[in-house]
């Protein structure tokens, strides 16, 4: 991860969907890809190659109607889903699953995100927030992503 400027990291700032794709793309050495998968990802945007490369590998998905919403803050359950898809792309184990029923808001995890969130908790990538909350629809911060990526890289040898 890089800072938002040369000398500012902004750990408490929210992370966007495009930023997640850019981080994962950078981990893979910034491979080329010029196939535009989404109507709202302009070829001139800084995230064009990262988003389209991640989409071509099944790491990220759109939000409907051919869009990606690159500048929207990523939710914690979306982030868990993207990281699990990235682990699968790497050939890593994605079968781990923690019992998340102990979190006060476990029932609010979307059905499509159940397995990714359980996997992220099992792998030590995601932990609760104050109040014993998993906060699946809460936005992920840059600090949370930094910790998740550190743990991910240790778990998957990146």
Task: Give residue spans per PLM region.
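Feature responds to low-complexity, polar/acidic, surface-exposed segments characteristic
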Residues: 2-50, 57-77, 85-113, 127-140, ...
